Amino acid sequence: MKRGSQGEAGSPQTEEPEPLFSEEDRSLRDGNALDESDSEESQYSGLEDSGTDRSDDEEDHWSEEEENPGKSPKEIIKVPNRSSKSPADSAADEEDRPNEIKEYENDSSDEEDIRNTVGNIPMEWYKDLPHIGYDLDGRKIFKPLRSKDQLEEFLDKMENPDYWRTIHDKKTGQDIKLTDEQVDLVERLQKGQFGDINYDPYQPAIDFFTHETMIHPVTNRPADKRSFIPSLIEKEKVSKLVHAIKMGWIQPRKPREDTATYYDLWAKEDPNSILGRHKMHVPAPKLPLPGHEQSYNPPPEYLMSEEERLSWEQQDPEDRKLPFLPQRFNCLRAVPGYARFIHERFERCLDLYLCPRQRKMRVNVDPEDLIPKLPKPRDLQPFPTIQSLIYKGHKDLVRCISVSPSGQWLVSGSDDCSVRFWEVSTGRCMKSVVLEGAVKSISWNPNPGLVLVAACVDRSVVLINPGLGDRLLCSATDQHISGYQPPEEEVQQPVTWEEVEGAQYSNGLRLCIKHQKEVKQVTFHARGDYFAVVLPDNGNSQVLIHQLSRRRSQNPFRKNKGQVQKVLFHPTRPFFFVATQRYVRVYNLLKQELTKKLLTNCKWVSSIAVHPAGDNLICGSYDSKLAWFDMDLSTKPYKVLRHHKKALRAVSFHKSYPLFASGSDDGSVIVCHGMVYNDLLQNPLIVPVKVLRGHAIHRDLGVLDVTFHPTQPWVFSSGADATIRLFT
């Protein structure tokens, strides 16, 4: 049935749609199709005969009679057979029907394009042929002529406003101009939208299957007959399988034998195995790329002069920087053959199979992981941050300072031949003692029961009672010194002990220990009865230890290895530290033996300080390094700090806080947090927390000495600018 008849039968009450063809066109089209199918002249129509042609024609006639109930079949237009007419008759018929609608002017949107009768076949078949297929009569459908060259295509692209909406149809071979609706459809598809603009993808969903049990089913379709009748096809398949099993054509699968498999752990290590050869294979290094000197026209600086050429010829082949002489040619055609080509290939072959190769493992490490995660300085307070007081009074370099055990008094020695005593809290100079020479080192006795200060002046060590503080302590100190009873038998000593009398005694001087050479340093033992001095000499008596109560002196070493710079007593154990230019030796005074030898990795040691616990030591040097030693860990530095820009003059530990400081010739004092844990498995924590500046640089000298307050987190520093500064 035709679509029109179906529409009339399905909806008789709706308005009849306007037909695409008139009745005459319909009969004309049917007649043409009928005549063409019955034509005897067409040798090949491209369609197979089917038994439905006649029935279709009869249905068409019945539909025409239904559409034209008032007309008889004789009134229906009959189109004569075109194949039986001559070309002249067909032309005359076309002139007689000027108003007749032509067949190619209208086409259905639902059917295939009637202008192309070749069918939906790949157009690549006729890619190299002049035609695109055959029509219903078997005649070739030639491609339309496309004589446009590139210039015409470009002009058409520039001048034709509809060029952008014109496409080429491969099936018909014609250019088609897209309508606005088609362009809108293409744009919507490119954007990923639906082609139909009226389509709503978000329509409300209707849930057919819910939790509520309905009375009527959703679908009441009856079951198929094949659903309850045994399948004959399956019966035949089963019978074939049974027959094959009986004949022995189908055998059951044999179970696999489970054999024990063992994994070879050393397969990759064996160089004879495939895995081992693959693992041990190292590709050969590539040849270096040629440089400018190997060019046929190198720059002038790569060409050798006559003197350089003679020198190159006189050298041995292994000493030459280049194995050839760079030359210049006008063009590449003038370059002769390379004479060393075979020799270089031979050397390359020797390198490939004679030189061993080594694989270097490249470790990808994040640079952030190499930086230690240190706590923030504000979490490590208290520590000195600002300059609070300036002690002025000296007229020359203040080389040394020391604090009393109570922390109330400060003593300083200067090159102006004076020793001054200061009150820490007010900055007032309480007393000044003028000596015979410049004061190189000074130390306050750590025993809180004595008020005694030792100062190094030229070749003497002077013991001074400043008379400050408690008068009972001052008188007890004088009684301790004057209560000495000389031995019955005099013992030969390397020094001379002399008591001071007269004006010097009233000025505070009590004892004077005269040495044979200039004294550089003095330091007290933790109990205050022993003190050691350093004589800067290459002899055997560089270090002397004095006992105050018995007024005895002794040389603990028969021979000194190197020039001694500093000495220190261990705070709790009978150990004695001796620092030479490059090493720090630790001696046991009871056993009289060398315990350890610390390697400082410095060029010249300037100062040392021992942690109050006694297991760690810091060492400053003139090459701007500060080395921290963990003596329980190693004889090498645990950490080396290079924070200062110039030589370090002094280092010091705090007695109760985890702080240490260093003074340098750059005029700065750097305070660091140095926490030592009781757990031996945990390394010390070292964090620089503050850089203190204030001293002026004078004669290329900055900070000369540094010491901490015994109870407060304060630090004192003396400098070449003749001042002492307190940082709190």
Swiss-Prot record:
Residues 55-67 have a biased composition (Acidic residues). GO terms for biological process: maturation of 5.8S rRNA from tricistronic rRNA transcript (SSU-rRNA, 5.8S rRNA, LSU-rRNA); maturation of LSU-rRNA from tricistronic rRNA transcript (SSU-rRNA, 5.8S rRNA, LSU-rRNA); regulation of cell cycle. It is found in: Nucleus, Nucleolus; Nucleus, Nucleoplasm. Keywords: Nucleus, Repeat, Ribosome biogenesis, rRNA processing, WD repeat. Disulfide bonds: none annotated. Component of the PeBoW complex, which is required for maturation of 28S and 5.8S ribosomal RNAs and formation of the 60S ribosome. This is Ribosome biogenesis protein bop1-A. The gene is bop1-a. Its main location: nucleus.
